Amino acid sequence: MAKHLFTSESVSEGHPDKIADQISDAVLDAILAQDPKARVACETYVKTGMVLVGGEVTTSAWVDIEELTRKTVREIGYTHSDMGFDADSCAVLNAIGKQSPDINQGVDRADPKEQGAGDQGLMFGYASNETEILMPAPITYAHALVKRQSEVRKNGTLPWLRPDAKSQVTFAYENNKIVGIDAIVLSTQHSPDIAQADLIEGVMETIIKPVLPAQWLSKDTKYFINPTGRFVIGGPMGDCGLTGRKIIVDTYGGMARHGGGAFSGKDPSKVDRSAAYAARYVAKNIVAAGLADRCELQVSYAIGVAEPTSISIETFGTGKVSEEVLIKLVRQHFDLRPYGLTEMLNLARPIYQATAAYGHFGRNEFPWEATDKAEALRADAGL
């Protein structure tokens, strides 16, 4: 039997890079709420005592960037200087300018359906039937651990927790089927007055055990809880944070390929984001239809051109029909032009800040997670 291990990681909403992502998407949402046709590319940098918000925006909306930034940081949980970052006292610098008219002329069209892609690029979407949400298990449970850390921090169950945390889960596979969890890493920022033994017990009993399925844990499973022994200095005081630096955490935890484009701070005309969402939608519907156990779709674009320059599909030997048939079905059932996919998934609205922590995929509140095309795909495939 073929055995292998596979590992994915996640980070909490208080991780510096995720603070940046959430601020960028908070700005995007605030603009889209007033101006759904806005062009937004918002980047954020955070470091001890400061936030820099920059980028290019074309919009009729007005947003109080400083207040929005402070509100976002406050909701994450950085509310006191003893954490090294305080929403009410940090400096907020605004360096937002206008989008280049050279880009606008390539994107805007008299016929909206012929809207060109905002840039060239390649994007991937992926789905797998190894979990109920049709996501890879390693990233799914890595997210669940840091999400649980946030919940028990905010509700006071473990009051000594602080916002910054990271998780990592290693799954064991035989013949591409999960047989157990080999290793778990969870590092969480904490107040200075908690003993290491109490921290380990609290994390194990309150975070790890309630989240990970018992049938995948064994006496051989390895646990690494705050393995350095101390994690008091964290967040932007420990490391600077930048928008778009957690692209594998945001997607499939390394189980699928990645085109390189980040998501946060970008409006739906940026295919880095919208086409990656559409590619997940397509791949998930193919797997939900039973046409493959695993599916990875690649789509690519040229700046200013509406039609994708390529569509390709890989089913890793699990397809019930040929990949050529799948591509034909995709072209028949999904409009992957920038305007088409924005309309198909109703993307021109303020839904993005919620995506900026704990993964963009595998969360059924988002429209690209619907499986409403599965039945029609299955019927047209003749299954």
UniProtKB/Swiss-Prot annotation:
Q: Which cofactor does it need?
A: Mg(2+); K(+)
Identify the residues that bind Mg(2+). D17
The UniProt note on the cofactor reads as follows: Binds 2 divalent ions per subunit.
| Annotated residues for binding of ATP | H15, D164, A165, K166, R230, F231, D239, R245, K246, A262, K266
Recorded coiled-coil stretches: none
Give the catalytic activity.
L-methionine + ATP + H2O = S-adenosyl-L-methionine + phosphate + diphosphate
Question: Which keywords, in A-to-Z order, does the entry hold?
Answer: ATP-binding, Cytoplasm, Magnesium, Metal-binding, Nucleotide-binding, One-carbon metabolism, Potassium, Transferase
One family name in Pfam for this protein: S-AdoMet_synt_N
EC number from the UniProt entry: 2.5.1.6
Looking up Gene3D superfamilies in the UniProt record yields: 3.30.300.10
**Which superkingdom is the protein from?**
Bacteria
A Gene Ontology BP annotation from the UniProt entry? one-carbon metabolic process
Residues at which L-methionine binds: E56, Q99, D239, K270
The pathway that the record names for this protein is: Amino-acid biosynthesis; S-adenosyl-L-methionine biosynthesis; S-adenosyl-L-methionine from L-methionine: step 1/1
Give GO terms: molecular function aspect only: ATP binding; magnesium ion binding; methionine adenosyltransferase activity
Residues that bind K(+), according to the entry?
Answer: E43
In its keyword annotation, does this UniProt entry include ATP-binding?
Answer: yes
Q: State the residue spans of region: Flexible loop.
A: 99-109
What SUPFAM superfamilies does UniProt report for this protein, alphabetically?
S-adenosylmethionine synthetase
Output the PROSITE patterns linked to this UniProt entry: ADOMET_SYNTHASE_1 (PS00376), ADOMET_SYNTHASE_2 (PS00377)
Biological function: Catalyzes the formation of S-adenosylmethionine (AdoMet) from methionine and ATP. The overall synthetic reaction is composed of two sequential steps, AdoMet formation and the subsequent tripolyphosphate hydrolysis which occurs prior to release of AdoMet from the enzyme.
Assembly, per entry: Homotetramer; dimer of dimers.
Please report which protein family the annotation says this sequence is part of: Belongs to the AdoMet synthase family.
Q: Under which name does UniProt file this protein?
A: S-adenosylmethionine synthase
| Organism of origin | Shewanella putrefaciens (strain CN-32 / ATCC BAA-453)
State which gene encodes it.
Answer: metK
